[in-house]
């Protein structure tokens, strides 16, 4: 089996990808048998290519799955932890813009009564 490209896999449906994954997973055992029985040299180096192909298929499956989950949870209030943006603990606990802008009644009254004075400098 030739080297599989990820861009070719992205257009396929999930069922096709799973079928291809099963085919690829069966291949290394056959190649190992060929290695023990003294098969051709081309088959010996093929194990590495097959392993990488399995990894590519799994990567594409996982990426499409995560992409679909992102679409599903877009605009919802609660999201799974792995879909939330990666932030430090301190950033997660920080006040948001709305909470920072809130003022107490006393502060609002003070701002209203004693606004900042603006002076014009005479040249």
From Swiss-Prot:
Keyword annotations from UniProtKB, A to Z: Cytoplasm, Ribonucleoprotein, Ribosomal protein
GO CC terms in record: cytosolic large ribosomal subunit
Location of this chain's protein in the cell: Cytoplasm
A Pfam cross-reference name: Ribosomal_L29
Disulfide-bonded cysteines: none
Subunit structure: Component of the large ribosomal subunit.
Annotated function: Component of the large ribosomal subunit. The ribosome is a large ribonucleoprotein complex responsible for the synthesis of proteins in the cell.
PANTHER family xrefs: 60S RIBOSOMAL PROTEIN L35 (PTHR45722), LARGE RIBOSOMAL SUBUNIT PROTEIN UL29-RELATED (PTHR45722:SF2)
UniProt-listed HAMAP family: Ribosomal_uL29
Protein name: Large ribosomal subunit protein uL29
Organism: Platichthys flesus
């Amino acid at each position: 089996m030739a080297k599989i490209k990820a861009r070719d896999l992205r257009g396929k449906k999930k069922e096709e990808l799973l079928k291809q994954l099963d085919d690829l997973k069966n291949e290394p055992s056959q190649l190992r048998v060929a290695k023990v029985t003294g098969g051709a040299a081309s088959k010996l180096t093929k194990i590495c290519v097959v392993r990488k192909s399995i990894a590519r298929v799994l990567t594409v499956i996982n990426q499409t799955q995560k992409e679909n989950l992102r679409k599903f949870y877009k605009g919802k209030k609660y999201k799974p932890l792995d879909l939330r943006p990666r932030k430090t603990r301190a950033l997660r606990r920080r006040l948001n813009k709305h909470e920072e802008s809130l003022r107490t009644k006393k502060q609002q009254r003070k701002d209203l009564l004693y606004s900042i004075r603006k002076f014009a400098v005479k040249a």
